[in-house]
Amino acid sequence: MLSDYLQTVDWSRAQFAMTAIYHWLFVPLTLGLSIICAIMETIYYRTGDPFWKRTAKFWMRLFGINFAIGVATGLILEFEFGTNWSNYSHFVGDIFGAPLAIEGILAFFLESTFVAVMFFGWNRVSRGFHLSATWLTAVGANLSALWILVANSWMQYPVGCTFNIDTVRNEMTSFWDVLLSPVAVNKFTHTVTSSFVLAALFVCAVCAWYLLRGREQKMARKSIAVASVFGLVCALITAFTGDLSGAIVARVQPMKLAALEALYDGEEGAALTAVGILRPEAERSNNEDAFYFKIAIPKMLSLMSFRDADAFVPGINDLVNGNPQYGIMPTIEKIERGRVAIAELERFKQARETGDEATLDEIRAKFDPDTPEGAVFLKEYFAYFGYGYLDSPAQTVPNVPLLFYSFRLMVGAGCLFILVLAAAWWFNRRDTLERKRWMLWVLLLCMPLAYLASQAGWIVAEVGRQPWAIQDLMPVGVAASRIASGSVATTFFIFLVLFTALLVAEISILCKQIKIGPEKE
């Protein structure tokens, strides 16, 4: 039974990861291209130039293809919370379900309503109403992203909630704390602006293809003029929010930061590793250098993490074994405290079965934040509740090589995109872009790199918080449903075939429409 449940957990993780990866292949383009279409239609509305109407309609056609297929994968992703992660859904459904419900009721219906006007309202409604519908579609798409990212951010940094021992559920106490937590605000800004960059590079890549083939040169140059400026501004914002994210992660998820940097032993004035190759045999328990070679920037990690070049940045060993000098509790003690909290829950369950009201009242007081004993117990023991389900401290260490290389792919690509978009804008402004074929090829190659960087960003976010489904409160190992592993494995392969077919269909349809090009003038 236990071995089958462990297989269920692994298959559920694999299925969710696969679904999320496929879904995120469609989402960034939807978010960014909707804004670009709205900008182009705004230019048409202000100038009355039919060229911009023709251009906007072309990009809307590509947006529509991507939007339709992205919705299908997103619906399946949400259903998996109930089918594969029912323990998680019960434990935090009151909190996690709220933003998802708002996303479905408000954002999704907003974009679903106005997307019809956006596609079929040309020459049927006024220009002003059509422009409003296009902008509302874009706003709706990005509002959907807001609520999904708020829910995800709460998993990374659970705030605005309290634990109800009678229902064994976490319940929301402050909607605004959940919505406006520093993790949520930063994650939304960083994720959405990076999606805008991807969409801008998509537009530039398609236009580069037209210029290489000597087709639709005016449309290509004008589209690059819009996309390069839009993408460059968003790339700079993405870099800024990425820097802020480092400071936030250092405070709320120090193990993630240590794994991203492959920092095993903490240091004052810690250096930031720009590039490096890890030794695969490096282990948590030894102090040898984890790299074959690396190029590091002195004191930069401390400066970026704590805004102090001499600040102490804890390493993996510090977080696992503890470091009394810097007030870091060893993980084994967190595990012991978590087991105390779990034991109290078991006592409560037994007291309820026997009708022992005195014991029930005693334990309720421990879980009540408004009582003196509750204030102490919740801070000293329940704060480490999730650790009680772990077997060893080593389980708190995520996959260091995967995180280390994914992070550098994401950051390196982001820096490259700033340079590429700036160069594209400059050459296009000087009317020399179509003659610089090497630059057109760079724009083409940046499109798949943008998708890789976007996926790498989610690997950093999600693998970096392992083993937690909810940071410090619920490990992934206890979040899954108790269903047969064979059922999850079967649906994994069904979804894999389905999503692959959808992806192939999208690519083929997009390529066909790009070859057809805009409507004839």
Positions of PLM-derived features:
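Membrane-interface interhelical loops and short amphipathic "cap" helices
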Residues: 1-21, 48-55, 79-101, 153-189, ...
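Internal alpha-helical transmembrane segments
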Residues: 116-124, 129-135, 146-155, 175, ...
